[in-house]
Amino acid sequence: TVQVVSPSVWGWRENRIKDIESHVDLTMCLFKFECNFYASKNMNSFFLGHPFSKLQMGDKNAILSKHGLEDSKDFVSILPGSRRSEISQLMPIYIQSAKKLLEVNPNIFFLIPAANSELADAIASHQDINQIPHSLATEAAQDFLSISTISIVTSGTASLEAAVLGSVPIICYKTNAFNYAILSRMVKTPFIGLPNLLLQEHVFPELIQQDLSVDAIVSSYSEISSKPQRYQSHLAAMNDSMNGEGFTAAAQAIKHLL
């Protein structure tokens, strides 16, 4: 049996590894650190690579024209999440942070992609959103991230997408105290952001629970802005780490099992 895409046993509910060991002969992994985890358990795995490694930054001029944006602005993307609960919890903090960031850099223009029209409406309904210069659009994440040097991102695959497209992510997460108490006991990794997990180093800011505040977001923005080359080199290293052995080699690995 070949398992395509490993469950996140390296991060939480590690006891599931027993079922995988009993029923799976080879696991195809999206990330190299997953292969290292399986090797530590004396289990077979193959580094396929992540589909995001194929993402390409869009053409800036085409994106500006498509969305009616001015080239002179400093773009910062805000990705508040793909669930209404995340948007409800985090969007007020993001809007207040955006106001504060405009005091630091009045030339910022905020780009807010939404996964669908329902989530766009949820974002647009938030108080004070019209007090910040912004563009809110559906199905625009890749466009917006391609032209944003920095992004404020709710933790999840969006943080990886941002990093791949050259936008340094400020990774944020907050939930209610009960949920956090459960999650913090289950999660076994030192980082929650995929970009940091890939680098195995705390490179990109992670503002989690009580550490998430307006001041923390502004401080993270200032830190990243002051060292652009350092962060871009980390993005390049992260992107390199995502290139797996590919489908042809994967087919050969499967053939050897037969």
Named regions from a protein language model:
Residues 1-258:
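Nucleotide-activated sugar donor-binding and catalytic core shared by glycosyltransferases
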